A protein has these predicted regions:
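Long, low-hydrophobicity, acidic/polar, solvent-exposed interaction domains
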Residues: 2-199
Length: 199
């Protein structure tokens, strides 16, 4: 029997333009997707060799921020809060990789959605009732829920970006956005790769 995926769009909460890109730091998770590619030929990006996903919580560099006064790419205060992780999905009924991080940060919402899903599977709710109640839960501002900012490097593949968006749906994340890499993100990634070279 074929199945369809119900897509839940991000919430339409009222946010004025100046606050749109400023997220409460305690709620923020930034995901950076990147890919290692073969050499470009005639301006065409090379084939993807491997995809990478990184994340940090709060602001770049944590509370102290980032400092690279001499511009060598190594952060002076050694406060790089960027972590490498993978898109792993579930194993033995447990979330793995970035899914586990997002699930833990959105725990209150996920627990309520899981209970609702159990009622729906037991035929206690119609599809319409389930979708309406799930939307209410995802948008309930009294629940602790993260704001996820997804950023892609110039080398990132569409596959990694789509995987990041899939994780928003899987983990019932209602507040997320795709944004551009900025200087702080690039500095964190460069510093991380100096300390942890790719093999």
């Amino acid at each position: 029997k074929s199945q369809t995926l119900q897509i839940s769009l991000p919430t339409n909460e009222k946010v004025d333009q100046t606050e749109q890109n400023k997220v409460k730091q305690s709620e923020a998770i930034t995901i950076i997707v990147d890919s290692e590619r073969e050499e470009a030929v005639d301006g065409v990006p090379g084939k993807v060799k491997k995809n990478y996903v990184y994340y940090y919580e709060g602001k770049p560099g944590g509370e102290l921020g980032i400092v690279d006064e001499n511009g060598d790419g190594v952060l002076d205060n050694a406060n790089n809060n960027l972590k490498e992780i993978e898109f792993l999905g579930n194993a033995n009924g447990q979330a793995q990789g970035i899914r586990a991080v997002l699930r833990e940060r959105n725990k209150q919402v996920v627990e309520k959605i899981d209970l609702l899903k159990a009622d729906w599977r037991a035929k206690k709710l119609t599809d319409e009732q389930y979708q309406a109640q799930a939307k209410e839960i995802r948008n309930d501002s009294t629940l602790k829920r993260p704001t996820v900012i997804i950023k892609a490097t110039a080398q990132a593949s569409y596959e990694t970006l789509v995987s990041a968006l899939d994780e928003m749906q899987i983990n019932s994340i209602s507040k997320y956005q795709i944004d551009n890499m900025n200087a702080a993100d690039s500095a964190l990634l460069k510093d991380y790769l100096i300390a942890h070279p790719r093999k």
